[in-house]
Amino acid sequence: MGGISIWQLLIVAVIVVLLFGTKKLGSIGSDLGASIKGFKKAMSDDDAKQDKTSQDADFTAKSIADKQGEAKKEDAKSQDKEQV
């Protein structure tokens, strides 16, 4: 009563084929499949890239600000040594 029967689905499918044609439906299906494949590939590439960067090196990454801070500390130490 409330559900869609197999016959109603077949009638809808026949109407869709008559409206769009088999060539158009085939191209839509292949385009949809290609886009899904590209999406899955992009998702797996992101995961692989993230794993590679997180396990790439044994040392901790330092930012430019950290390097500049260390350089200032070394300059201050060398100036202190010169003053003594």
From Swiss-Prot:
Region (Disordered): 42-84
HAMAP family registered for this protein in UniProt: TatA_E (MF_00236)
Quaternary structure, from the entry: The Tat system comprises two distinct complexes: a TatABC complex, containing multiple copies of TatA, TatB and TatC subunits, and a separate TatA complex, containing only TatA subunits. Substrates initially bind to the TatABC complex, which probably triggers association of the separate TatA complex to form the active translocon.
Protein name (record): Sec-independent protein translocase protein TatA
A Gene Ontology term for the protein's cellular component: TAT protein transport complex
Its membrane topology: Single-pass membrane protein
Membrane-spanning intervals of the chain: 1-21
